Curated annotation (Swiss-Prot):
Residues 109-127 have a biased composition (Basic and acidic residues). Its cofactor is [4Fe-4S] cluster. It is an enzyme of class 2 (transferase). Residues 1-25 form the signal peptide. [4Fe-4S] cluster 1 binds at C177, C182, C188, S418. This is Lipoyl synthase, apicoplast. Belongs to the radical SAM superfamily. Lipoyl synthase family.
Length: 442
């Protein structure tokens, strides 16, 4: 029996190590002259690019995307690393890919890969840039150098103006004429026209064009305001009155019941008086809209203020273009006897095409009356005036609007949504009624 000594153990360990080392050297030597069955190490970068491109693929049918990327990979790698079956497989995939592209109307991703990466998304960028190039109103931006001559108006004076101002102060009533710094206050008050502002003088919204005070928690409405308003209006020698208000999102119904009570008291004392109400959107509350529409008013007014593109730059975030149009449409559906009315400010960077599109949207929602006026910045803390629109352009919008079928349009640099509302509206209404009467007699 042989006994293994320590020296034999050492010798055996040495032999094993030598054989392992020789075997590894042989494999390395053979590998230098062998044909690779796998892609060389340099293709790892290509694989990374392929993976990135595949992640950016927007094709709905991902199976076809994978097929395309497999074809693309074979084209890049060549026949060397795919064996003798590469050519047949490539031709098959090419024919299938061509069929898929034909059924999809062409492969947009393949065309995109042919382009320089710098041009990827160029169409979308150009579309965005075309909108970005349009001017936008912004607080603090540079104003036009000089206000045109047609904006020069005399300071408010006159006996009627002073009497009306005293009555409003005595009854603790507010007017949008004063709060919004309307340039026509002297002219309107001297002919006995005023726009009474209900629900206080503090708004819960902060539109960037308006100078009315704002607060998230304004004072509660004055319970005596409907009575005082009705008393003042009945004492004035007027046949048309405009009631408006601040936005009161803090109230459950947005102040609709307060409006309705005021209208009821006015109509009780003077049923013949015509009432126009310029109201908020009530956050789309149908019950509030219904309450106002059935309150006895003749004209339901709500302003969209500007074109669709500029809404988020001009109005409070809680207001929007679609909701404003929907409110007017809904009021008309609830009470078809109502006249609906809206207003647009010009000079905020809108284009002619955008104004015409807004007019078409308004008319599509069966709105009867629209007014156009020039936006004037109340203070330096409000949006800048992008341009002063010429009187000729205001006339152009009026002509185009009448072609669209509006019942009446007031358009001019100094026109406001309530500016001479009774004069404009009554004149047009009387002319329409006269035309119907003459037609019936004929």
């Amino acid at each position: 029996m042989h006994v293994l000594t320590p020296s034999l153990y050492i010798y055996a360990f040495f032999i094993v190590c030598v054989r392992l080392k020789c075997g590894r050297s042989k494999r390395v030597a053979n590998a230098k002259h062998a044909t690779y069955d796998m892609p060389p190490k340099g293709l790892r970068v290509r694989d990374m690019l392929e993976k990135t491109a595949q992640q950016n693929c927007n094709q709905r049918k991902r199976g076809k995307c994978r097929k395309f990327f497999f074809l693309w990979k074979m084209d890049k790698m060549g026949d060397t690393h795919l064996g003798g079956q590469a050519n047949g497989r490539k031709n098959l995939l090419r024919s299938e890919s061509a069929t898929d592209e034909a059924s999809l109307g062409g492969n947009p991703l393949k065309e995109k890969l042919k382009e320089s990466p710098a041009n990827w998304g160029k169409d979308k960028q150009e579309e965005q840039q075309s909108t970005d190039r349009l001017p936008l109103p912004k607080v603090g931006n540079k104003m036009p150098e000089k206000k045109p001559d047609w904006f020069h108006v005399p300071a408010p004076t006159g006996k009627k103006y002073n009497e009306l101002k005293a009555d409003l102060k005595k009854l603790k009533l507010h007017t949008v004429c004063e709060e919004a710094q309307c340039p026509n206050i002297g002219e309107c008050w001297n002919i006995g026209t005023a726009t009474i502002m209900l629900l206080g003088d503090t708004c819960t919204r902060g539109c960037k064009f308006c100078s009315i005070k704002t607060s998230s928690k304004p004072l509660p409405p004055d319970a005596n305001e409907p009575f005082n308003t009705a008393k003042a209006i009945c004492e004035w020698d007027i046949n048309y009155v405009v009631l408006t208000s601040v936005d009161r999102d803090d109230l459950p119904d947005g102040g609709a019941s307060h409006f309705a009570k005021t209208i009821e008291l006015i109509k009780f004392s003077r049923p013949e008086i015509l009432i126009e109400c310029l109201v908020s959107d009530f956050q789309g509350n149908v019950d509030s809209i219904r309450k106002l529409a059935n309150s006895g008013m003749e004209v339901y007014a709500h302003n969209i203020e500007t074109v669709r593109r500029l809404q988020k730059f001009v109005r409070d975030r809680r207001a929007n273009y679609e909701q404003s149009l929907w409110v007017l449409k809904t009021a008309k559906e609830i009470n078809p006897l109502l006249y609906t009315k809206t207003s647009i400010m010009l000079g905020l960077g809108e284009t002619k095409q955008e104004v015409l599109q807004a007019m078409a949207d308004v008319r599509q929602n069966n709105i009867d009356v629209i007014t156009f006026g020039q936006y004037l910045r109340p203070t330096k803390n409000h949006l800048n005036v992008v341009e002063y629109v010429s009187p000729q352009m205001f006339d152009y919008y009026k002509e185009e609007g009448m072609k669209m079928g509006f019942k009446y349009i007031a358009s001019g640099p100094l026109v406001r949504s309530s500016y001479k509302a009774g004069e404009y509206f009554m004149k047009n209404l009387v002319e329409q009624r006269r035309g119907v009467k003459l037609h019936a007699e004929g």
